[in-house]
Amino acid sequence: MGKIIGIDLGTTNSCVAVMDGDKARVIENAEGARTTPSIIAYTDNETLVGQPAKRQAITNPKNTLFAIKRLIGRRFESEEVQRDIKIMPFEITRADNGDAWVNVKGDKLAPPQISAEVLKKMKKTAEDFLGESVTEAVITVPAYFNDAQRQATIDAGKIAGLDVKRIINEPTAAALAFGLGSSKENQVIAVYDLGGGTFDISIIEIDNFDGEQTFEVLATGGNTHLGGEDFDNRVIDYIIDEFKKEQNIDLRNDAMALQRVKEAAEKAKIELSSAQSTEVNLPYITADATGPKHLALNITRAKLEALVEDLVASSIESLKAVLKDADKGVSEIHDIILVGGQTRMPLVQQKVAEFFGKEARKDVNPDEAVAIGAAVQGGVLKGDVKDVLLLDVTPLSLGIETMGGVMTTLIEKNTTIPTKKSQVFSTAEDNQSAVTIHVLQGERKRAADNKSLGQFNLEGINPAPRGMPQIEVTFDIDANGVINVSAKDKNTGKEQQIRIQASSGLSDEEIQQMVRDAEANADADRKFEEVVQARNQADGIAHATRKQIAEAGDALSVADKEKIEAAVAELETAAKGEDKAEIEAKIEAVIKASEPLMQAVQAKAQQAGGEQPQQSSAKDDGVVDAEFEEVKDNK
């Protein structure tokens, strides 16, 4: 059995780790980086993921997708999606099931299908490191993700060819990374996780007793639509508004210009974590009848902080609420862990320190802690990590709609999972033969104000006066936070149950089709790579052969020279096509035709008393591989 890898599927960046002995290790990707941008680009020939996708974003803005995690498991009509539609350069569209999907080159793609491309890159990164196939993973999600978002993340794993053994909350994973092996007893930590697109705060108690560590989540909260992207958007809006004041041109109408501004805004935000001011310079950003326009703007750290102070303040309000839910005071928190790239911002660090009255820990890598924790959980599931018990919670209350449009809660938020809870209900009318069980998730009293997870009917109830039949409704939440609901007529014994898949989401058939598409694309990608390698080999041989013809001079007969040059020309023509077999055949033809050339070059070298040159071979892998990598990355 292979390893269970840990994946932090982030909004902005993703990371993969694995247990290496008794420690978790972050794995570098093919580009040598420890994190991979969660960016996917669709070009005419291939699908790019990570840094190669990011590099071409400016010239391909409508087909370069980022921050897809903000769409996963969301309805198109939701307020969050409608807000994103206005600022994303790519097209967000309504799927037939009501979900938010993305339109790329005329094809509608589901967020899990897009996220699967990032997961496939993480999977391959791990496989290249381990030297074996990887089929199992622990994937992290924001603690405040609802059921639909968790299901969609599991779907993304399936499409990527991964058996998702566990979904684990990001702050809990960070706590595992921080606390594993610690000898301290009964410490309570706060994990403040402000990532690219989501914000979580969890209060976690770590106990050490008789050699066993218990990580118990006391309370969790947050906002699944607050993160670095929102900070970036404030800077983007400021830059665009200032340019509009000066030039009376709105750059929001130009997708390519908007992408350039986005990159500059992110860069400026990062620079202002260490500098007091930065210059945004974007020459030739646009043009009008009077000629090209250049964007030049100075942004100070004070200005950035003024633009985003309400976002930071809202995170502190969530912090207060979660501490109250955990029944803990500020003085009872031993350590504060900052997770997520946005926590590098000095204002964030300052406000968190002011709230707790102490500085956060500096020895936890905010970009890698979550993936490391996921790998630890993978080790626990595999049996490689022993004496560790993880007790997570459900982030939102769960219940059903009852008479009058009220939500009746069965499982309160911050209940430790896995858990099971039953409650008996009855009919609202005389002789009612069926009841509809409408499953809800949220904290509001009015059913319509909460998230609808789905509904089902229990039929065949015996006629009786209202209030007489006894309908037992049971909620069962597994360790992934995924919900099963059943309803049973205690009189007849009839039972109906469903695994909640929300009123939206992907059906099993759609997931299987996407898995097949992914496999087909993997085959197409492999063939494309083989063709590129063959082309590079052909180019190297053609170049070397022409050079040797020149070196041979008169030692090569005119007839042989013409024959070799004709073979090289045919090879160059074949290299422009897509047929790998033809390219390889033409390579062999050049090698065969070049035999008189090699003899002539060798004879000339012997006359000069020099060394015998080696024939340009189809096995000159060192040059070919390097050329291939460069071509692929810069596409």
UniProtKB/Swiss-Prot annotation:
It comes from the Bacteria. PROSITE patterns: HSP70_1, HSP70_2, HSP70_3. GO terms for molecular function: ATP binding; ATP hydrolysis activity; ATP-dependent protein folding chaperone; heat shock protein binding; protein folding chaperone; unfolded protein binding. Induction: By stress conditions e.g. heat shock. Pfam families: HSP70. The keyword Phosphoprotein applies. The keyword Oxidoreductase does not apply. Residues 602-617 have a biased composition (Low complexity). Keywords: ATP-binding, Chaperone, Nucleotide-binding, Phosphoprotein, Stress response. GO terms for biological process: chaperone cofactor-dependent protein refolding; protein refolding. The modification Phosphothreonine is found at T198. One of its GO terms (cellular component) is cytosol. InterPro entries: ATPase_NBD, Chaperone_DnaK, Heat_shock_70_CS, HSP70_C_sf, HSP70_peptide-bd_sf, Hsp_70_fam. Residues 602-635 are annotated as: Disordered. HAMAP family: DnaK (MF_00332). Acts as a chaperone. Belongs to the heat shock protein 70 family. This is Chaperone protein DnaK. It comes from Haemophilus influenzae (strain ATCC 51907 / DSM 11121 / KW20 / Rd). The gene is dnaK.
